[in-house]
Regions:
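Conserved anion/nucleotide-ligand pocket segment
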Residues: 229-231, 235-299
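Glycine- and other small-residue-rich loops at beta-strand/loop junctions that grip anionic moieties
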Residues: 185, 206-209, 231-233, 258, ...
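Acidic, His- and aromatic-enriched active-site or binding-groove loops in soluble protein domains
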Residues: 177-184, 224-237
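Short glycine/serine/threonine/alanine-rich loop segments
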Residues: 200-201, 225-226, 252-253
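Metallocofactor- and cofactor-centric catalytic cores in central/energy metabolism, strongly enriched
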Residues: 1-204, 214-220, 243-245, 339-398
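An acidic- and aromatic-residue-enriched active-site/binding cleft used to recognize and process polar
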Residues: 13, 156-158, 208-211, 233-234, ...
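Glycine-rich beta-alpha junction loops
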Residues: 14, 62-65, 235-236, 259-266, ...
């Protein structure tokens, strides 16, 4: 549909991943960039009625006071990404979309994230119910003001600490009773998720945070006939693991140990410097080797905050494996990339595919998006090639 208008609502709007995705969308709209690094620009997807850049309107929530222009200029200064002329050319669009961003919430987001908040409105509501109602009011206003056909809520905020789920999360009735009793039983990521899904809007979790990955939220997805997916975008070291581990399995090498050491210095790195937040990230990074090879080698993942690296991250992996006649050998690789540049195109891919699925009337977890995530909801398969085959089969089927 040529005149379709869709909303992309980003949780963590002023962050590096979000701002880079928005700059990319604005540049694409002006024919200032091509489709390099966007999966949905491959010929496989040509026959799908995916949204082009002209269809999108952007908004979001954030707990900090900033703007899309400030965020991309900051990345340009600190990490030497983007061309200054590109930012200037897209500035009017960034300012227009930035006007749609509203104050987020730090309720139950954890101490490390709360320290980042400098917007006083981020701490206004004191119960999950009040926060959910405020988020819903923002989403409804965004949709109405911009005359949007659809709104997708996509979480690209900082990683929350692990959140223990209990009996109140196991069904919608139990969850709603706890919510009405004003209990603080969900983290901020799940408040955004519940708010969106309850309005029938798709919700995607690009972070390791809880989001919609509990039974009551998934029941609500079915009840409201919408879609969800995630978790934790797969952009760097874990992507390499999901590509290399199948090679070891298919060549029948036995992996003895796999050690991955990660260093980076952006705001996400600062949050992950907190041991509680780091635990959430390590859980999603350290699970796939065993699933792919069918046994459990010794594994270790470390994440360290190195301030001077800014948005550039380095992963060094050491793989000790056994070959023919019991001979032990070693493979090492170094992955160096710009965190936001790696993640942003996937945000646009996921947005296009999710909006497409929602328009088709699909309901539930979007399993076909597994190749984009470290911990894909509804999918136990971690082999990247098997995951991508799921996406190929979906595209050919529809």
């Amino acid at each position: 549909m040529k005149n379709r208008r869709v909303g992309l609502w980003l949780i963590g709007a002023w962050g590096g991943v979000s701002a880079t995705a928005v700059l990319g969308l604005a540049a694409w709209k002006r024919n200032l960039t091509d489709g390099t690094s966007m999966v949905t620009m491959l010929p496989l997807f040509d026959a799908l009625d995916l949204d082009g850049p002209d269809a999108f309107v952007v908004g979001g929530h954030d707990i900090r006071q900033s703007s899309f222009v400030d965020a991309v200029q900051d990345l340009h200064r600190r990490s030497n990404v983007f061309d200054a002329s590109l930012i200037d050319a897209c500035k009017p669009q960034l300012e227009e979309w930035g006007a749609n961003v509203r104050p987020g919430t730090i309720l139950n987001a954890g101490a490390a994230i709360a320290k980042l908040a400098d917007n006083p409105e981020a701490n206004l509501a004191d119960t999950p119910r009040a926060v959910i109602e405020r988020i819903q009011a923002d989403l409804q206003k965004f949709k109405a003001d911009n005359k949007l056909d659809q709104v997708l809520v996509l979480n690209v905020s900082s990683t929350e600490p692990p959140f223990a789920i209990g009996e109140s999360h196991q069904s919608m009735p139990k969850f709603l009773r706890a919510l009405e009793a004003r209990q603080n039983m969900i983290p901020a990521s799940s408040m955004y998720a519940w708010a969106a899904i309850d309005l029938g809007m798709p919700y995607i979790n690009f972070t390791p945070s809880l989001g919609a990955s509990f039974v009551a939220a998934l029941e609500l997805v079915q009840e409201r006939k919408t879609v969800t997916g995630g978790k934790d975008g797969k952009t760097g070291e874990t992507l390499m693991k999901s590509v290399l581990a199948p090679m070891f399995a298919l060549r029948n090498f036995r992996i003895l140990s796999w050690v991955g050491h990660n260093i980076f210095g952006n705001r996400d790195g600062l949050v992950l410097d907190d041991p509680a937040n780091k635990e959430s990230k390590i859980r999603t990074k350290d699970q796939l080797i065993q699933q792919i090879v069918g046994y459990k080698p010794q594994t270790h993942v470390s994440i360290e905050y190195i301030e001077s690296l800014d948005d550039w991250k380095t992963a060094w992996d050491h793989i000790h494996f056994q070959g023919f006649l019991g001979t032990k050998m070693i493979m090492q690789f170094i992955w160096q990339g710009c965190d936001s540049i790696l993640a942003a195109p996937l945000v646009l891919d996921i947005a296009r595919l999710t909006l497409f699925a929602h328009r088709r009337g699909e309901v539930g977890v979007l399993r076909q998006l597994a190749c984009f995530f470290k911990s894909p909801m509804g999918v136990e398969e971690h082999d990247f090639f098997e995951q991508f085959r799921m996406l190929e089969e979906y595209v050919r089927a529809v």
